[in-house]
Amino acid sequence: MSQSASNKAWQARREAAVVNGVGTLLPVFIERAQNAELWDVEGNRYIDFASGIAVLNTGHNHPKVVAAVRAQLEKFSHTCFQVTPYPGYIELAEKLNALVPGPTPKRTLFLSTGAEAVENAIKIARAHTGRSGTIAFKGGFHGRTMMGMALTGKVVPYKTGFGPFPGEVYHLPFPSDYLGVSEADVLAALDLCFSSDIEPTRVAAIIIEPVQGEGGFYPASASFMLRLRQLCDQHGILLICDEIQSGFCRTGKTFATEYAGIEPDIMTLAKSLAGGFPLSAVVGKAEVMNAAKPGGLGGTYAGSPIACAAALAVLEVIEEEQLNQRAQAQGEQIKARLQQLAERFDCIGDIRGPGAMVAMELVKQRDAARPDADLTKRLVAEAGKRGLVLLACGVRANVIRFLAPLTASPALVDEGLDLLEQALLAAQG
C-alpha cells in the first residue's frame, strides 16, 4: 500500500487543505461502508455507533435507498423546484404531511440542512404571528447558522468567537431529574422571562427538542410537553418541535413528540430523513406554513430530486423493516448492557433515553455534580483505537450517545458493546 493511501498521509493532506474550524472525531479516513460497519483506507474495520451523527437510521448504503437514488440519477439530478418542479418533492411532502402528528391539515417545505430548517421555521413563525421573539432552551442545539447559534444553548465550540447573534432570543433551563432541574423550575423561569425579559404577546415561538441531542439526550416528559403546548395556546405562541436528531424512529416512535400526544405547530426534520443525502423539512399546520409569501422560502438545492428519491425509499424501509420496533429492541439491548457496566464502574452516573436514543453520563464516583469530561474524551479515543465509533455530547461534555443504525443486527451491537467495555477499562487506567 502506498503512503498516499494511509490514514497518516490523508491526515497530513487534510491539515494542509481543510480549515481548522471543521473538527474531526477520529484521524481515520473512510473508504467504504455497509449497514453499521465502516472500513478505512487501510482496510481497518469499525462498528459505527455514530451513524454520521444520527443520519443513518436505515444504515449505510441500504439497497433500497441506493436503488432509488440510482434510478433518479438516470432521469435527472437537478432542475430547482422553484423553476421546474418535479413529482418526487410533492410525493414526499404528501407522505410527511400524513406522518407528522396531529389532525390539522399540514404543509411541507424542503431544504438541505437542519440549520436551514430551523432558520425557516423561525421565519414562518414570525410571518404568521407578526411577532419577533423566540424562546429556546439551555443545552439545545439548532445549527451553526447565525439564528441557529442564537437559539443554541451551548457555547463551546459552536458560539465561541462568532457573536453578536440575532436578538430577542431567550433561554430557559431544560428539565432534568438527574441534574435537579424540575418542570416547576422551568415553568417558573418562563414566568420570570415573561415578566422581566419579553411579554408573551411579542413571542412568536418556543422551540424545543423533545429529546435534546447535542445537549445530552435529556428527554422532556410528556407532562412537560403538554404543559408547554397549553402555555403556547394560552398566549398565541407557536410551538416548534425540533426532531432533527430524534425523528424517524430513533426513539421508538416515528417522532418523539408522539410520546406526549401533542400536535406541534411546526416540526423541523433532517438527518435520517434521506438516508445520508442532504435533505431537511419544515412541516406544520397549513394555516401557519402558508403565512410566508411566494418567493420568501426555498433555495437552489432545496428538496433535491436525488434526496427526495432517497427519502421516499427511507420511508418504505421504515415501514417494511419495522424500525420503530427495532429501535425499541436495540435500546433495551444497549441499556441492559450499560446497566451491567454501571454495577461495576462508578463513573456511570446515568443511563437514559427513549428507544435507541440512548445516553450514558460519565461522572466521578456516581456524583451528578462532578462531570468527567476527561474520561469521556479518553473513552471516545480508546473506542476508536479498538474499532468502535462513538460520539460524546452534553453541555458538560461528559455524555456518550449511542446512535447505531437501527438496521444493525443484535450480534453486531453486542460486538460494539464488548469494544465499549474494553475501551472503558482502558480509559479508566
Question: Residue spans of the language-model regions?
Answer:
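Conserved N-terminal phosphate-binding loop of PLP-dependent enzymes in the Aspartate aminotransferase
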Residues: 1-429
